[in-house]
């Protein structure tokens, strides 16, 4: 879970996409919170805010889950919620990438950056943590039956 928190936090600070302008100009970079235009200006985009909120809540829930190690059922339910939020982030990103949800601040062809893969990596890490917590819960139940 700690790796999932770190990966989510890194995803907040690195660009998730780039937009090559249709005419002449430099590429604009898309972050989870907004767009850095080719001229160096920062535009907080209403289109990108859901990406920021989803990834931030995912990181916070993953961090909270670490400290709930004594309550495995709550841990598993928070892991499920975290995975749902990460899937929602991926869907929102794909909709932006395909142009179904346009970014009004810049126009052009959108490309994928490396940081767009980080929430997917985090999703895999949370799924692995969920499996580990579930296995621990089964082990504890089996030990209780033996007594």
Where on the chain are the PLM-derived regions?
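N-terminal signal-anchor transmembrane alpha helix
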Residues: 1-18
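Alpha-helical transmembrane segments and their helix-start/interface "positive-inside/aromatic belt" motifs
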Residues: 1-5, 73-80
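Hydrophobic residues within the alpha-helical transmembrane core of Major Facilitator Superfamily
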Residues: 9-10, 66, 91
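Perimembrane loop-to-helix junctions flanking transmembrane segments
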Residues: 23-43
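Hydrophobic alpha-helical transmembrane segments
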Residues: 49-65
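Juxtamembrane helix-break-helix junctions at the cytosolic face
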Residues: 63-76
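Transmembrane alpha-helical segments of multi-pass membrane proteins
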Residues: 77-91
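Alpha-helical transmembrane segments of multi-pass integral membrane proteins
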Residues: 90-147
């Amino acid at each position: 879970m700690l790796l999932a928190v770190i990966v989510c936090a890194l995803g907040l600070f690195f660009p998730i996409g780039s937009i090559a302008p249709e005419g002449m100009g430099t590429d604009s970079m898309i972050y989870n919170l907004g767009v850095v235009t080719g001229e160096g200006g920062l535009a907080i985009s209403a289109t990108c805010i859901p990406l920021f909120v989803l990834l931030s809540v995912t990181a916070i829930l993953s961090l909270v889950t670490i400290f709930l190690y004594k309550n495995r059922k709550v841990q598993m339910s928070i892991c499920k919620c975290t995975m749902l939020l990460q899937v929602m982030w991926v869907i929102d990103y794909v909709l932006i990438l395909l142009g179904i949800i346009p970014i009004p601040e810049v126009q052009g062809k959108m490309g994928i950056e490396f940081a767009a893969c980080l929430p997917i990596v985090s999703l895999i890490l949370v799924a692995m943590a969920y499996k580990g917590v579930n296995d621990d819960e089964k082990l504890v139940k089996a030990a209780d039956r033996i007594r």
